[in-house]
Structure formats: structure tokens, C-alpha cells
């Protein structure tokens, strides 16, 4: 069992039951999945960009990402339908908790001028989104072997009904909120 998964069962669940007064353990919000998405508009000109991004995401997530393709053509961006324009990977279960552990304890502290993550990035339904500007904050990425700095979006989906419940859940996982 992953370290954060054990931590969730032993510390987070009792803490949230006490804070919100849930009657059942099944009412306690939990993280269902974490989605990592990398949009690669520059992949239209160079096909190597997709390969390098897929390699980076594989190292970060520990599983192979899916290459996302354009749904429709956009002449202004020189994109045709079916062109590869991004990569995404969905993590669940053990891999999700392992990634969350690495992200909170190792990757976030490596961000330059880090003062905490925004507490306003919730969507109103208990899900949280974080934008990472550089993939080099992850220790799996070798700085000397990357071709370009790429950002990625990390979307954390929870079963929480409100943003307050989701924020309490993530805060109990030691998420460094600044507000």
C-alpha cells in the first residue's frame, strides 16, 4: 500500500469525520483520479516534440500517456483534424497516491520562488487544478536531456461535494495552500 494511501486511511479519514461530522466512512471525500495533461501546440511544426513530451510524461507519471489529437481543423493555428496536439495520462489507485506523494513532498518544494499553491483553483464541484510551468521540478526528469521546458496541467478529481471539503481533504494531505 502506498504511503499516502495508508496516511489517508489512518489520519485523513478520522480528521475529516471529526471536522465535517460525517455519519459514514463512505461519506468522507477521497481522491478518485489525477490527470496530467500537456498541451503541445508546437507539435504541428515538429513531430519530435510529441515523442519528447510523451517520454517526459512517462517518466513523471510512471505509465504511458495517450496522445491527444485535434477534434477539428483550425486554420489560424495551422491545425488539421487528427493532428497530434497533446498528451495526457490518468492515474488511479496506487499510482495516483505514489504520484501525489512525490508531487507534494518532492516536486512542489523544487519550484522556484514557491510560496504555496493557490486555494482558489477549485472548480465549484470539489476538483482542483494546478498548472506547472516547467517539467524539471520532477526529480525523474534529467535537466541535461530535455529539449525544451514544457508546462503541464494537473487535475485532481475528488468525490467532495463542495470546494471547502476538497480543500480540507487536500490540506490534510499536506498541500501547501497560500490562502
Swiss-Prot record:
Looking up SUPFAM superfamilies in the UniProt record yields:
RL5-like (SSF55282)
For this chain, the annotated S-S bridges are none
Keyword rRNA-binding (UniProt): yes
Q: Name a GO molecular-function annotation.
A: rRNA binding
Keyword annotations: Ribonucleoprotein, Ribosomal protein, RNA-binding, rRNA-binding, tRNA-binding
Role of this protein: This is one of the proteins that bind and probably mediate the attachment of the 5S RNA into the large ribosomal subunit, where it forms part of the central protuberance. In the 70S ribosome it contacts protein S13 of the 30S subunit (bridge B1b), connecting the 2 subunits; this bridge is implicated in subunit movement. Contacts the P site tRNA; the 5S rRNA and some of its associated proteins might help stabilize positioning of ribosome-bound tRNAs.
Quaternary structure (record): Part of the 50S ribosomal subunit; part of the 5S rRNA/L5/L18/L25 subcomplex. Contacts the 5S rRNA and the P site tRNA. Forms a bridge to the 30S subunit in the 70S ribosome.
Name of this protein: Large ribosomal subunit protein uL5
Q: Which organism is it from?
A: Burkholderia thailandensis (strain ATCC 700388 / DSM 13276 / CCUG 48851 / CIP 106301 / E264)
The organism's lineage is: Bacteria, Pseudomonadati, Pseudomonadota, Betaproteobacteria, Burkholderiales
**Which gene holds the coding sequence for this protein?**
rplE
